[in-house]
Amino acid sequence: MTTRKLFALLALAAAIGLFVPALPAPAEAKAFTVGIPLPLTGAEAKFGEMEKQAYEMAVDEINAKGGVNGVKLALDIQDSGGKPETATAIVEKFITINKYPIVVGEYTSQCSYAVAGVCEKYNVPYLVVTGAADKITQQGWKNVFRLNPPASLYNLGVFSFFEQVARPKTIAILYENTDFGNSTSKAMKDYCDSHGVYVVLSEGYQAGAVDFKPILQKVKSLRPDIVYMVSYLMDASLLMRQSKELDINPQAFIGGGAGHTLPEFLQNAAEASEYCMSATLWTPQVKYPGAKEFFDNFKKKFNKEADYHGAEAYAAAYVLADTLKRSKAATSDDLRASLAGTDMMTAFGPVKFVSWGQFTNQNKMDTLVLQVVGKKYETVWPSTAASAKFVYPVPRWRERK
């Protein structure tokens, strides 16, 4: 019996009040499979690997407890290489050949936006998990739901830190020329323009550059209070190493999430990562139910730490399970309706899809500020969520031990 038929029979039985002992036992039912494109190779592979592991860990937990309505979950994870055209082809196959009624995942904003367009075309619901460019949920698409905040809201915690602690007068903004980089840096520039923080430099760069010294020399000559960067892992690491080499000394280096929050950033940037701050959506110190357990179990299982990207993927699997549990049938129409009614707490935080302004089916949540203190990440803002006291202004490079 197919999963779709099984859900339909269960719904019919519930509707007419019948007890149906003759339904197949869970072991006889086929698993419900969800398609997930992810970058498992290429520049974003570290993010894709973490998310893949988090999805799999969550599904193992769900299945160990009997699955969803007695039906096990299965994942069909395919490597997009971080390329929108590849992600599009994968999802076309998911929908037209595999007949999957829902799609979850991807990592970059470009790939997520491309996948969203395909899902809207075929009227199949799509749960965005990490793609952050504002435009993804600004198209009025009825099939696209986003778990993570839009890029323009990533810095809410940083803005609060500026207003209550740092009170900077000048800032330099460096960002990669991607959808995520453009959206996040624009939000920072707009905030600064409206709050009296003078933007001495706002400059994009090609992701994957091998030398940032020309742009960093500009930053050094302008001597801003804050150096703000939106970068993926390798760029974030190189920017910090070369900032140290050039002896650039702002009151703080602050990342816009992404590469500045990965555990590998601490390794790659080494001593240059110390005291670096970043916007983040989640840390293991948050008080959400299951957050610390997820972090500890992930570290035990994979011998490495998860950041907010892993927490997003882990939570997305539970959102999927909740959606299936409440759905009348495993069809795209029913799953879309069920997804729209989501209102739950996860290890990543609250999930409820709402519409406001230009956003449609968008989750809302608070954001945080972390800082590398003593060679490890600590939550430093807001103070109510802090695991350590922030260091601001940061010591000059030559004053550090």
Which ranges hold each PLM region?
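Extracytosolic ligand-binding ectodomains
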Residues: 2-19, 23-401
